[in-house]
């Protein structure tokens, strides 16, 4: 199989879907890897490194898309890339379709087989989402601390305080991978940290991890409102796999915050956790202000640390890519339940139930989509 890796074109997205090490892995499995020239430069991987690993360097993105049996990316295709979609193409990338109706329609209409990193599930975990969630969580606190500086428009708070001066208050909504790593960095900076989650079992786990160094609260409107009101930094990190993110922090809650406070919405890929966040921002223009509160809603936070993020991502994606390339999409889906859970669109059908529910499509299971195609 020919695996194509185009350069990412989303604003300031410097990650790349394949490292030279990943190229070697796929070539050793008997496949061809074509990389668009310059695709790895943002992550400090030179074209020469890919060539030495055995990849073919391709001059244009169009040729990469046209030649490939499977395209591997980091972020979802943008509208300028929809023209490359075609029946029989496998697309393996982050998709976040519940928040992307136009992309979903393009995938359905073109009959691409779209396998989403973020919904591949193993024993209740999301192994292809985890490394980027770790990066995004750690970055979220760093970013929030930066924008609390007065020069950035913040309220002039040092999260760790100093002797005789109170510490900054950080509230993390969602105690999953993102939230846990955000809390770790906030604690490391010396902040006063609260984690809010809906799952009492998870709250007990967090208490075991952090002990008495953090406060845990059950998620409900009252607790969220009280915590948000007193916070300097609020990080939204609640994700429901494949679905739109819940708007847990209301406009009224945000109006109760002090001017210069900061919100970081890590869930913006799926629509965001804050009612006042109605659009993603970019690394070029990361902040907007509403109710005198700074809103950071960049959808590709790990793109700011591309070397770390790229290596972490490809460590987990390439083994699945080898299976898909070696067996073909249908056989890989049939043989591996994890890959099955990643299939969001196939043969013109929406095959991930949460996406179908959010966007108003009829849900067709991947197994039935395969059968329907075989009957044609």
From Swiss-Prot:
Entry-linked PROSITE patterns: ALADH_PNT_1, ALADH_PNT_2
Chain sites annotated for binding substrate: 15, 75
Record's keyword terms, sorted: Cytoplasm, NAD, Nucleotide-binding, Oxidoreductase, Sporulation
EC code(s) of this entry: 1.4.1.1
Pfam families (UniProt xref): AlaDh_PNT_C, AlaDh_PNT_N
Active-site residue numbers: 96 (proton donor/acceptor), 269 (proton donor/acceptor)
Protein name according to UniProt: Alanine dehydrogenase
Oligomer status and interactors: Homohexamer.
Keyword presence, Zinc: no
TM helices/strands, residue ranges: none
InterPro entries referenced in this protein's UniProt entry, alphabetically: Ala_DH, Ala_DH/PNT_CS2, AlaDH/PNT_CS1, AlaDH/PNT_N, AlaDH/PNT_NAD(H)-bd, NAD(P)-bd_dom_sf
Described function: Catalyzes the reversible reductive amination of pyruvate to L-alanine. This enzyme is a key factor in the assimilation of L-alanine as an energy source through the tricarboxylic acid cycle during sporulation.
Naturally occurring in which organism (per UniProt): Oceanobacillus iheyensis (strain DSM 14371 / CIP 107618 / JCM 11309 / KCTC 3954 / HTE831)
Binding of NAD(+), residues: 133, 177-178, 197, 219, 238-239, 266-269, 298-301
Enzymatic reactions: L-alanine + NAD(+) + H2O = pyruvate + NH4(+) + NADH + H(+)
Family: Belongs to the AlaDH/PNT family.
Enzyme class: oxidoreductase
GO molecular function: alanine dehydrogenase activity; nucleotide binding
Involved pathway(s): Amino-acid degradation; L-alanine degradation via dehydrogenase pathway; NH(3) and pyruvate from L-alanine: step 1/1
Main location: cytoplasm
One of the record's GO cellular component terms: plasma membrane
NCBIfam families: alaDH
Subcellular location per the Swiss-Prot or TrEMBL entry: Cytoplasm
SUPFAM superfamilies found in the cross-reference section: Formate/glycerate dehydrogenase catalytic domain-like, NAD(P)-binding Rossmann-fold domains
BP GO annotations: L-alanine catabolic process; sporulation resulting in formation of a cellular spore
Keyword Transmembrane: no
Top-level taxon of the source organism: Bacteria
């Amino acid at each position: 199989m020919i695996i194509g890796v185009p350069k990412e074109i989303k604003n300031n997205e410097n990650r790349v879907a394949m490292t030279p090490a990943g190229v070697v892995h796929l070539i050793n499995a008997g496949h061809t890897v074509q990389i668009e020239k310059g695709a790895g430069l943002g992550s400090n991987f030179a074209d020469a490194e890919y060539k030495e690993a055995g990849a073919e360097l391709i001059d244009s993105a169009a040729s990469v898309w046209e030649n490939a049996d499977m395209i591997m990316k980091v972020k979802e295709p943008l509208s300028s890339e929809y023209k490359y979609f075609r029946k029989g193409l496998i697309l393996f990338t982050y998709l976040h379709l519940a928040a992307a109706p136009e992309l979903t329609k393009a995938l359905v209409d073109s009959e691409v087989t779209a396998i989403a990193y973020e919904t591949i599930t193993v024993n209740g975990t999301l192994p292809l989402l985890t490394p980027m969630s770790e990066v995004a969580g750690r970055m979220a606190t760093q970013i929030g601390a930066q924008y609390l500086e007065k020069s950035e428009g913040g309220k002039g708070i040092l999260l760790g305080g100093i002797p005789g001066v109170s510490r900054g208050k950080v509230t993390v909504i969602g105690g999953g991978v993102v939230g846990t790593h955000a809390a770790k960095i906030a604690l490391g900076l010396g902040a006063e940290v609260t984690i809010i989650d809906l799952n009492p079992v998870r709250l007990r786990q967090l208490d075991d991890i952090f002990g008495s160094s953090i406060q845990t609260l059950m998620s409900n409107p009252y607790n969220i409102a009280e915590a948000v009101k007193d916070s300097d930094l609020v990080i939204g990190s609640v994700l429901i796999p494949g679905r739109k993110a819940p708007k847990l922090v209301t406009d009224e809650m945000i109006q109760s915050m002090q001017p210069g406070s900061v919100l970081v919405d890590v869930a913006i890929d799926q629509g965001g956790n804050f009612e006042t966040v109605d659009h993603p921002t970019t690394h070029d223009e990361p902040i907007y202000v509403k109710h005198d509160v700074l809103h950071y809603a960049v959808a590709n936070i790990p793109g700011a640390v591309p070397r770390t993020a790229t290596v972490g991502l490809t460590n987990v994606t390439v083994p699945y890519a080898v299976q898909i390339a070696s067996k073909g999409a249908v056989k890989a889906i049939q043989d591996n339940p994890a890959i099955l859970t990643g299939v969001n669109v196939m043969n013109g059908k929406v095959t991930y139930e949460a996406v179908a529910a959010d966007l108003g499509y009829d849900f067709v299971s991947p197994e039935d989509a395969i059968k329907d195609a075989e009957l044609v």
